[in-house]
Regions:
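Conserved nucleotide-binding/hydrolysis micro-motifs of P-loop NTPases
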Residues: 15, 31, 77-78, 101-104, ...
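Catalytic P-loop NTP-binding/switch module of NTPases
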Residues: 225-351, 373, 555
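Conserved C-terminal guanine-recognition region of P-loop GTPase G domains, centered on the G4
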Residues: 94-156
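Active-site phosphate-binding and catalytic loops of NTP-dependent enzymes
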Residues: 30-57, 80, 146-159, 190-203, ...
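P-loop NTPase switch module centered on the Walker A-proximal segment
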Residues: 1-104, 142, 210-213
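Charged, conformationally dynamic linker/hinge segments
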Residues: 292, 300-432, 445
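Long insertion/accessory domains within large nucleic-acid-processing enzymes
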Residues: 255, 260-263, 395, 440, ...
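Conserved catalytic-core segments of large NTP-driven translation/proteostasis enzymes
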Residues: 148-282, 286, 401-404, 465, ...
Length: 598
């Protein structure tokens, strides 16, 4: 009888998932007394910490009362949907973490639906009950309604609820009586989460995730489904296409605390990492060499969006970056394919650009941002959705969009979404907020987030997820305003910007270096405007240069990477270097642009 519990944690961004896991690790005495307790232990790459999102699923385990609890952290974001399904396959139960004030959110729904379909047993944790005006009882009912609407079984609906505050480090069965520690939660896990079934027979393991090490290459991570795996065992890798490849296990590690520990053998029900198997894909089976039986493969989410990646060929090429040639960028993209599953890289006609396919703007921008920090320079074109031909009809990806926002600005948002070919499927009001659901083409979502936040003064919460391919919906107006383009290369002067303020809003500040063909602002009209922002005031001997009028300029609009990618038009690129991000026309020369435009 093994004392193992495999549990996945499901939560919305910023409901305290990573903090809770930190506290569970503490309870399992992973950090020695007196050793500094780290924050956000699981989000261990800088990007994850800054954005507060978990991108890659991770595994840790703790020992408690002689039980081994494997904790599997899932990404909450629908752009990383490929990660979610695979990871839930390793668990027997799930911890649904909700904020006692906000209640379950659209993104939580996405992961929870997958978990319920797989038949996982849930435990609900109502977090942040120490906050004033929290409403645990109402939230409890909301969770019940949500599970009911996702067709949960009676057994799943009979879930225990634990209340507490991960930040203060306590959990209790009654929210009015705080305890000292989180043992109430750990006891509930042992009591309610079923133990993994032990299946005797020839060994089988489904590869659900992979790790990468520069010493041994790709490492297969998964849960042993049946039998046991031993070090040095001869195995068969059952591929997706039905073929079999013989291989041998060099080393087996199990997860122990935050790291891995080498073991001789691992039994069914435990999660392990296997070193020495080459050329595997996620969703394939490792089986006994003498009697190979493949498990059903898992489908990985298809990409729905593509962007052109190309080398930086702007006049400021190579000023900041360490890696700037096409060779560097190509190698880096190939390396990313090893661990990023929903990604595809396709060469184009030219030797220095590639089409990169991904799950959405966020998915691709996380890759670009990671590359930027590593010292790469590159340029990226406008995001395009992937169009398929189904039964001779042109089809495009359609997503389900949920928006939660204050009632007074709902009409503006509905108008905005319907202009982008969205159709409303549901509308309900709760207290003073509206909950809206739409189906909308993926093309319509590009750039929508910004517009929705502006129209609702930052109050709206928006989430979307891929639904299916549907027939093409027709043209969608993206951005109607033209661009303001720099005429010459040089330094921008306040004097020039001041005279041009009536022409639109600027993205640059005085003193910034610009080059000819760079997009420096947004024109108030719908055509492009070429201006000289490098002009300074000419002075005679009579005028001292200091006695100029003080210039008052509106502050420049600053874009985040996603905003810029969603903002640019089809004839523009975003140039990304370690220290800066600029938008530019693909053809820098004005005369050449006019010639092409004819």
């Amino acid at each position: 009888m093994q004392k193992i519990r495999n549990i996945a944690i499901i939560a919305h961004v910023d409901h305290g998932k990573t903090t809770l896991v930190d506290k569970m690790l503490l309870a399992g005495k992973l950090f020695r007394e007196g050793q500094a307790e780290p924050d956000q232990f699981l989000d261990n790459n800088d990007l994850e910490r800054e954005r507060g999102i978990t991108i890659l699923a991770k595994n840790v385990s703790i020992n408690y009362k002689g039980y081994k609890i494997n904790i599997i952290d899932t990404p909450g974001h629908a752009d990383f949907g490929g990660e979610v399904e695979r990871v839930l396959n390793m668990a027997d139960g799930c911890l649904l973490l909700v904020d006692a004030f906000e209640g379950p959110m659209p993104q939580t729904r996405f992961v929870l639906q997958k978990a319920i379909q797989l038949g996982l047993k849930p435990i609900v944790v109502s977090n942040k009950v120490d906050k004033p005006n929290c409403r645990p009882e109402e939230v409890q009912e909301m969770v019940f309604d949500l599970m009911f609407s996702l067709d949960a079984t009676e057994e799943q609906l009979d879930f225990p609820t634990i209340y507490g505050s991960a930040k203060q480090g306590w959990m209790s069965e009654d929210w009015k009586e705080p305890k000292e520690d989180i043992t109430a939660l750990l006891d509930a896990i042992i009591q309610y989460i079923p133990e993994p079934q032990v299946l005797e027979g020839s060994s089988q393991m489904l590869i659900t995730s992979l790790d990468y090490s520069k010493y041994v290459g790709r490492i297969a991570v998964g849960r042993v489904h049946r039998g046991e795996l031993r070090e040095g065992q001869e195995i068969m890798l059952c591929k997706r296409d039905g073929s079999m490849v013989k291989s041998k296990i060099k080393e087996i590690d199990v997860f122990e605390g935050l790291g891995r520990t080498k073991v001789d053998a691992v039994q069914s029900g435990d999660i392990c990492a296997i070193i020495g198997v080459e050329g595997f894909e996620i969703g394939e089976t490792i089986a006994d060499a003498n009697d190979p039986e493949p498990l059903p493969t898992i489908a990985i989410d298809e990409p729905t969006m593509s962007m052109l990646f190309t080398i930086n060929n702007s006049p400021f090429f190579g000023k900041d970056g360490k890696f700037v040639t096409s060779r560097h960028i190509y190698d880096r993209l190939m390396k990313e394919l090893d661990k990023n599953l929903a990604l595809r890289v396709v060469p184009t006609d030219s030797a220095d650009s590639w089409l990169v396919y991904g799950r959405g703007v966020l998915h691709l921008s996380v890759l670009i941002e990671t590359m930027r920090r590593e010292g790469y320079e590159l340029q990226v074109g406008q995001p395009q959705v992937i169009i398929k031909e189904i039964d001779g009809e042109k089809c495009e990806p359609v997503e389900q969009l949920t928006v939660n926002l204050p009632e007074e600005c709902s009409s503006r948002i509905i108008d905005m979404v319907t202009k982008r070919k969205g159709e409303m499927t549901m509308m309900e009001s709760k207290n003073d907020r509206m909950h809206l659901e739409f189906t909308i083409p993926s093309r319509g979502i590009i750039g929508l987030n910004n517009a929705v936040l502006t129209a609702s003064a930052g109050e709206a919460i928006m989430a979307h997820r891929f639904l299916e391919y549907q027939p093409w919906k027709g043209e969608i107006e993206r951005r109607t305003n033209g661009s303001i383009i720099a005429m010459e290369t040089g330094t921008a002067y306040a004097y020039a910007l001041n005279n041009l303020q009536s022409r639109g809003r600027f993205f640059i500040a005085p003193g910034d270096e610009v080059y000819a063909g760079q997009v420096v602002g947004e024109h108030t009209k719908d055509n492009d405007l070429v201006v000289n922002v490098t002009k300074s005031k000419k002075l005679t001997n009579m005028r001292a240069s200091g006695s100029d009028d003080k210039v008052s300029l509106a502050p420049p609009t600053v874009f985040s990477l996603e905003d810029a990618l969603e903002y640019i038009k089809g004839d523009e690129y975003v140039e990304i270097t370690p220290n800066s991000m600029r938008m530019r026309k693909i053809i820098l020369d004005e005369l050449e642009r006019k010639r092409q435009g004819r």
